[in-house]
């Protein structure tokens, strides 16, 4: 009734007040809770509704005594008379369906049972179809490994389309936020290649691709040199490439490689290497400056330093920028000594002191003795006696001098390692390089136990200062600072912020010098060590090109063994195994088998000398067998066959070939040729099986490794393929003759048919698959031969005998087929019956 009222609430009534009240009543009824408001909807068929309506109609009619309803309506302000008048005026006839014809209860029950049965059948069929669909999808996902999203990403990456990885970190954030204790590259789990730390795409543009190829060429040459035990200057190669590049970043990288170049062929001592590099760099700078401002006199190192002092410490009016310099004969003597030390020219500095001894102040006369001891010492240290005297003079006269020469203060500080609480002299250190050199000069790694704390200053103290300052204090010299101070791990970390490709190759350069171990050995055991993980750096880098350039990926992964530790070697082997399984580039990576059966090595085998493998054969066998199993599980039969060949598992190879050939023979159309004009042994199962049989079975060494049963099955299947070719060429008589020689079907009598039927269960599955086709071929040949004989105009006594003999063979085959019909496809037996009837 409410629905009827709702449909007609806009119609006119006897009064506007009644309409308004009824509309409000309808709207409020929608908000009333009911006993079934939280129950789900029930979907029933039309027939079920009819049945239930019929049951309801058969019950006693409800009483129509609604005398108390008007009290409820009156309390709500609704006049019962108005409602009654409105309801009477409703034209309900047009909304009511005619009464359905009366249905007899017995007929309704029978109708319900029948329809219910049909619904159950349809529901069962639908459930079976849904189950089959789910099973098929599960089979596809499990056996074919069709991860479409992954394949889509791989294809996009191969074509150079950059994909934003949700798991990658933002390498472009400020380097000042780097935590020096925590950087870690790659996943620490077992999966080396898929740590998802790399955002680099070497195929993003032509410039990046060209840079990638140039760097890869250097790595290839480096590996060739390693394999030949030759000497390859990898740093010089990168210097030659970066020398022609422009930009601030490239300038940093160029000088970084020059720092690495200075480390080769040396016993790596971070402090000494840093000092020597900075001294050579400064001397080269003064030489270039001297050539631009040629003065009178010989181009000696002393004259070059004097020229530098004139350029840097004099104003335009030739007056000194620092007023309190000690100038002797027009030369600031202490500045000259300082910059000679800055250039590593200790002998020249001593010579200058000796020549100017008479002009030095009385309080400074003893310094010449100290300096001689300093110059003659191997580690440039002073004896305890001299050190004590120098410290006394420094504290009493030099340090407290308000108008003293700052270069004299610097020289005293450097020679005696004085006042280490104030290591820097701003008036003297004109550049970051000067600041670095000053600190390196003051470092003393082997502090005596009785040395006071304020006189101790180690490399680690210096490294902590650099880390605390961060890149903002060093402008565009931060990378060089990290390398010169031995913070190689943080240097790689910092390079990642602006160029992942250069960071990786800088890591390669450091690894070639065995510098990773030095970096970790200079850390206190109390502090967490930086986890660089050279293996993961290289593995992450190969992410964007391991599919497009698997050969190049191998060249980088074999670099993991540069550190030569047992863990590094193991990681290298694991990374190569993952590369083979992931890229599936088996021919490129593992090799292939030539047409003559000879093994053609892949790139991994070519690089075996760099892999530090104990048993080369076992290593390749392990990788190949794992890849073969993966290919077999994924249903990639051709890859699996190739890999098992490389693993020299010849019996498994023949097993797979038998399965492939059997499937081809049983599933292919009998009216189509098995071998096409463009087929070859790499794509056609029949040609593949023939080549394998000719290579393996004729080789006594290989043949002994293959089970006799496998060889017999292979030969049987090859004979079936030959029969198929005869059948396709319509050579009916020859086909039957070869079929009889095959001895799989009964050709004599009923006893033979029964025996063959009993032996059917003992046949190999690869043969069982082909029995239905063999029966069809046999009966088709018999049918065609009988037809030819019947059409022949030649009449002889043997003609009838031939037909009877052929029909007898057909009869035995039908008896045999009848005994095994439930183990064959239904359509096969129907086809055989049709052929037999036509005979």
UniProtKB/Swiss-Prot annotation:
Region (Leucine zipper-like heptad repeat, required for interaction with NSP1): 25-60
GO biological process: nuclear pore organization; nucleocytoplasmic transport; poly(A)+ mRNA export from nucleus; protein import into nucleus; ribosomal large subunit export from nucleus
One term of GO molecular function: structural constituent of nuclear pore
Keywords: Membrane, mRNA transport, Nuclear pore complex, Nucleus, Protein transport, Translocation, Transport
Biological function: Functions as a component of the nuclear pore complex (NPC). NPC components, collectively referred to as nucleoporins (NUPs), can play the role of both NPC structural components and of docking or interaction partners for transiently associated nuclear transport factors. NIC96, which is localized to the core of the NPC and the distal ring of the nuclear basket, is required for de novo assembly of NPCs. It is involved in nuclear GSP1 import.
Subunit structure: Component of the nuclear pore complex (NPC). NPC constitutes the exclusive means of nucleocytoplasmic transport. NPCs allow the passive diffusion of ions and small molecules and the active, nuclear transport receptor-mediated bidirectional transport of macromolecules such as proteins, RNAs, ribonucleoparticles (RNPs), and ribosomal subunits across the nuclear envelope. Due to its 8-fold rotational symmetry, all subunits are present with 8 copies or multiples thereof.
UniProt-recorded name of the protein: Nucleoporin NIC96
Gene: NIC96
């Amino acid at each position: 009734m409410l629905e009827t009222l709702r449909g007609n609430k806009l119609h006119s009534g006897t009064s506007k007040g009644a309409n308004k009240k009824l509309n409000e009543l309808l709207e409020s009824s929608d908000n009333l809770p009911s006993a079934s408001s939280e129950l789900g909807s029930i979907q029933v068929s039309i027939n079920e509704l009819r049945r239930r309506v019929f049951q309801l109609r058969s019950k006693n009619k409800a009483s129509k005594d609604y005398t108390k309803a008007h009290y409820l309506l009156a309390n709500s302000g609704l006049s019962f008379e108005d409602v009654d008048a409105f309801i009477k005026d409703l034209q309900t006839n047009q909304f009511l369906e005619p009464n359905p014809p009366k249905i007899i209860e017995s007929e309704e029950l029978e109708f319900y049972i029948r329809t219910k049965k049909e619904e159950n059948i349809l529901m069962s069929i639908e459930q079976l179809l849904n189950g089959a669909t789910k099973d098929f999808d599960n089979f596809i996902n499990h056996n074919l490994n069709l991860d479409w999203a992954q394949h889509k990403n791989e294809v996009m990456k191969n074509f150079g389309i950059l994909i934003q990885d949700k798991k990658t970190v933002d390498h472009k954030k400020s380097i000042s936020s780097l935590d020096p204790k925590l950087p870690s590259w790659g996943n620490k789990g077992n999966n080396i290649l898929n740590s998802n730390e790399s955002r680099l795409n070497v195929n993003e543009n032509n410039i990046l691709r060209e840079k990638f190829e140039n760097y890869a060429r250097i790595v290839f040459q480096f590996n060739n040199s390693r394999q030949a035990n030759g000497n390859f200057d990898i740093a010089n190669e990168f210097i030659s490439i970066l020398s022609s590049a422009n930009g601030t970043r490239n300038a940093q990288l160029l000088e970084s490689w020059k720092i690495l170049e200075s480390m080769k062929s040396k016993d790596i001592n971070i402090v000494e290497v840093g000092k020597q590099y900075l001294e050579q760099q400064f001397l080269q700078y003064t030489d270039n400056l001297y050539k631009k401002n040629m003065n009178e006199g010989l181009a000696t190192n002393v004259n070059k330093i004097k020229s530098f002092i004139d350029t840097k410490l004099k104003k335009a009016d030739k007056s000194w920028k620092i007023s309190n310099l000690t100038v002797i004969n027009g030369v600031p003597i202490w500045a000259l000594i300082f910059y000679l030390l800055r250039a590593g020219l200790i002998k020249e500095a001593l010579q200058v002191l000796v020549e100017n001894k008479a002009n030095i102040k009385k309080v400074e006369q003893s310094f010449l003795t100290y300096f001689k001891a300093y110059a003659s010492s191997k580690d440039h240290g002073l004896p305890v006696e001299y050190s004590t005297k120098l410290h006394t003079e420094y504290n009493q006269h030099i340090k407290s001098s308000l108008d003293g020469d700052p270069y004299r203060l610097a020289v005293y500080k450097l020679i005696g390692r004085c006042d280490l609480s104030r290591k820097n002299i701003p008036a003297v250190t004109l550049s970051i390089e000067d600041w670095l050199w000053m600190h390196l000069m003051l470092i003393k790694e082997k502090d005596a136990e009785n040395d006071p704390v304020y006189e101790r200053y180690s490399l680690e103290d210096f490294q902590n200062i650099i880390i605390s300052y961060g890149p903002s204090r060093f402008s565009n010299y931060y990378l060089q600072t990290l390398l010169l101070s031995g913070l190689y791990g943080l240097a790689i970390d910092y390079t990642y912020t602006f160029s992942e490709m250069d960071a990786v190759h800088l890591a390669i350069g450091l690894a070639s010098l065995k510098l990773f171990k030095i970096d970790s050995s200079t850390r206190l055991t109390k502090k967490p060590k930086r986890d660089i993980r050279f293996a993961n750096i290289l593995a992450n880098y190969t992410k964007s090109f391991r599919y497009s350039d698997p050969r190049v990926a191998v060249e980088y992964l074999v670099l993991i063994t540069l550190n030569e530790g047992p863990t590094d070697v193991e990681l290298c082997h694991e990374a190569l195994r993952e590369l083979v399984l992931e890229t599936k580039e088996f021919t490129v990576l593992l090799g292939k088998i030539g047409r003559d059966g000879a093994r053609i090595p892949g790139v991994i085998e070519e690089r075996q000398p760099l892999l530090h493998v104990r048993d080369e054969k076992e290593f390749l066998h392990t990788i190949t067998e794992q890849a073969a199993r993966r290919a077999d599980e994924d249903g990639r039969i051709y890859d699996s066959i190739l890999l098992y060949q490389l693993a020299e598992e010849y019996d498994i190879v023949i097993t797979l070939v038998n399965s492939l050939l059997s499937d081809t023979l049983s599933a292919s159309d009998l009216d189509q040729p098995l071998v096409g004009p463009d087929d070859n042994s790499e794509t056609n199962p029949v040609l593949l099986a023939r080549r394998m049989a000719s290579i393996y079975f004729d080789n006594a060494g290989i043949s002994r490794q293959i089970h006799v049963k496998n060889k017999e099955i292979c030969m049987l299947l090859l004979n079936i393929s030959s029969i198929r070719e005869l059948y396709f060429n319509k050579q009916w008589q020859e086909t039957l003759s070869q079929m009889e020689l095959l001895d799989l079907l009964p050709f004599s009598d009923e006893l033979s048919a029964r025996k063959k039927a009993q032996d059917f269960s003992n046949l190999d599955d690869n043969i069982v698959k082909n029995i239905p086709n063999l029966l069809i071929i046999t009966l088709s040949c018999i049918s065609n031969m009988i037809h030819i004989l019947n059409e022949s105009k030649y009449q002889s006594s043997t003609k009838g005998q031939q037909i009877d003999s052929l029909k007898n063979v057909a009869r035995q085959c039908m008896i045999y087929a009848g005994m095994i019909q439930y183990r064959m496809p239904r359509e096969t037996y129907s086809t055989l019956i049709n052929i037999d009837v036509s005979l």
